[in-house]
Amino acid sequence: MNLSNLKPAEGSTKTRKRIGRGAGSGLGGTSTRGHKGAKSRSGYSKKVGFEGGQMPLQRRVPKFGFKNINRVEYKAINLDTIQTLADAKNLTKVGISDFIEAGFISSNQLVKVLGNGALTNKLEVEANAFSKSAAAAIEAAGGTVVKL
């Protein structure tokens, strides 16, 4: 045995299917594609959402709603969260930078303070928006509301 007469092991390789090479090959004629129809044609690719001519689901279901391009999204932060943050870091002024540092928001998010919980400290709170109950609770505790 040498490099010039090496052969693959018996049964380890298959001869590839040569289609469309005449009737004598056994794979001529329709070339394993069956008769007619889109799948037998060259360049065929199934379109996304195509259901064989049936009205596709996307067109059967009615349209509804829209995305309001003027919508302003706020990240909600409650008073009890602000209180725990102020206690942990011994703060008298709580602002956007403190929320970012604590990981409550990312740098491009807007903050709305909501009135869930209670404040015990006198705090100056900076945010983009406040609910009426939150603003009242902050001022009742002797603090100030700074709307950015």
Swiss-Prot record:
Disulfide linkages recorded for this protein, renumbered to the chain, are none
Q: Compositional bias (Gly residues) at which positions?
A: 21-31
**In UniProt terms, what function does this protein have?**
Binds to the 23S rRNA.
UniProt feature coiled coil, ranges:
none
- In this chain, the stretch annotated as Disordered covers 1-51
Write out the GO biological process terms.
translation
Record note on quaternary structure = Part of the 50S ribosomal subunit.
Citing just one GO molecular function, the answer is:
structural constituent of ribosome
The superkingdom listed in its UniProt entry is: Bacteria
Instruction: Note the PROSITE patterns from the entry.
Output: RIBOSOMAL_L15
The question of whether Phosphoprotein is a record keyword is answered with no
Question: Which NCBIfam families does the annotation name?
Answer: rplO_bact
Q: Which SUPFAM superfamilies match?
A: Ribosomal proteins L15p and L18e (SSF52080)
Pfam families noted in UniProt: Ribosomal_L27A
**InterPro entries xrefs:** Ribosomal_uL15, Ribosomal_uL15/eL18, Ribosomal_uL15/eL18_sf, Ribosomal_uL15_bac-type, Ribosomal_uL15_CS
Kindly state which keywords UniProt assigns to this record, in alphabetical order: Ribonucleoprotein, Ribosomal protein, RNA-binding, rRNA-binding
Record's protein name: Large ribosomal subunit protein uL15
State the organism named in the record. Bacteroides thetaiotaomicron (strain ATCC 29148 / DSM 2079 / JCM 5827 / CCUG 10774 / NCTC 10582 / VPI-5482 / E50)
Q: Which GO terms describe its cellular component?
A: cytosolic large ribosomal subunit
